Amino acid sequence: MQIKHLITIFFLVLIVADHCHAFLGMIPGLIGGLISAFKGRRKREITSQIEQYRNLQKREAELENLLANLPVY
């Protein structure tokens, strides 16, 4: 075999092995995501994020109100 064929096959095997390794590494995360979706954890996380966003908006409005009431120097 010529060297260019060997290099081509080597890179092809390297790419396939890398993709298989990445796929096998993704499987535990996918399983964990499915389990948490079935248990409803994601819904609770979204609810807490909405509350944090509302609190942030409230604090931001209070800060704007405070800055508007400060005298200009």
Swiss-Prot record:
Residues that make up the propeptide removed upon maturation: 45-73
Signal peptide: 1-22
GO cellular component: extracellular region
Expression tissues: Expressed by the venom gland.
Coiled-coil residues: none
Further remark: The primary structure of the mature peptide is identical to that of NDBP4.23-like from Tityus costatus (AC Q5G8B5).
Protein role: Antimicrobial peptide. Has a high antibacterial activity against the Gram-positive bacterium S.aureus (MIC=5-17.30 uM), the methicillin-resistant S.aureus (MRSA) (MIC=17.30 uM), and E.faecalis (MIC=69.23 uM). Has antifungal activity against Candida spp. and one Cryptococcus neoformans strains with MICs values ranging from 6.25 to 100 uM. Also shows an inhibitory activity on C.albicans biofilms at high concentrations. Has a moderate hemolytic potency (18% at 20 uM).
The protein, known as: Antimicrobial peptide TsAP-2
Record organism: Tityus serrulatus (Brazilian scorpion)
